[in-house]
Each structure stands twice: as C-alpha cells, then as structure tokens.
Regions:
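Membrane-interfacial segments
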Residues: 61-65, 99, 103-107, 134-142
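Low-complexity, intrinsically disordered extramembrane tails and loops of integral membrane proteins
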Residues: 1-19, 141-147
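Amphipathic, cytosolic membrane-interfacial segments at TM-TM junctions
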Residues: 63-82, 137-145
Length: 147
C-alpha cells in the first residue's frame, strides 16, 4: 500500500518570537515552581501567579504573530496547559465542595486527602507540560498538539 505523506509549509519564526516563547515558558515555570517554595500547591500557584497570567495574556495577544511557524504549537501547548489545569482544578473544587456539605468526618478523612493527592498530581502534570514544551523549544521543534 502506498504511503501518503502530507507536507505542510511552516515558515521560520523571527528570533524575537523565539526569545519571547522562552520568556513565556520561564514565566509559567516561575509561577509553578513558586508552589514548591510556598505553602501553595504547584497548580494553584501556576494558575494564580501573576507571571503565568501575564504569559497567557501575551500568548493570546501574540498568537497571530506565530501563526504558520512551529511556535504556534508552543503557544497552543501553553494555553492548553493553563486551560486544562484550570478546568481540572474547578472540577476538583466542585467535588470537594460536594463532598464537604455538610462538613463531616468523611470529608476530612476521605474528600480532603483525595483533593490533596489530585492537586499534587495536577501540579506534576503542569511541571511535565512546561518541561516538555520548553525542551522541544530549545531543540527548535514543534509540540504535537491534537486538533
């Protein structure tokens, strides 16, 4: 059977945009790592930290500038990391609130530990996504983002 290949044209990005993408990964990483150094969880520090929020705003503003380059995949990767982390944190909060009404021993000994484990797992996932994306950027490669 013949193999079908699809070749897409990707233009080389300007160096300033590559540098900007490194800065955005650094901002996300800084916010996430603050969760290790403070009483906050990694994921809450990542989502509520000013550097991460500013990085997301810049991602949205500069999205058109990177369209058609391999940096487009990195911008999508960063936005999806933030968006999915926020979504899962909201889901976790809703589950905890649902289990927590009324406040019982079950909530304290079952719901809260589940939420803590979930928040730690989500934080590890955020760190993984930042590291994987940044390493691909260092190599000058796009990130595979499902459509």
């Amino acid at each position: 059977m013949a193999e079908i290949t699809v070749e897409t044209r990707v233009s080389a990005p300007r160096q300033s945009l590559v540098t900007l993408t490194h800065v955005l990964y650094a901002m996300h990483a800084f916010s996430a790592l603050m969760g290790l150094l403070t009483p906050a969880f990694i994921v809450t520090s990542f989502l509520a930290g000013w550097p991460s929020i500013i990085a997301v705003i810049v991602n949205l503003i500069k999205r058109d500038d990177v369209r058609g380059t391999y940096l487009e995949s990195h911008f999508s990767w960063q936005l999806r990391t933030f968006g999915y982390a926020l979504l899962w944190l909201v889901v976790m909060f809703l589950v905890l609130v649902t289990l927590g009404i009324p406040l019982t021993l079950v909530t304290l000994f079952v719901g809260l530990p589940i939420a803590v484990v979930f928040a730690i797992g989500l934080g590890i996932w955020v760190l993984y996504r930042i590291a994987r994306g940044w390493l691909a950027l260092i190599e000058g490669k796009p990130i595979r983002v499902p459509s």
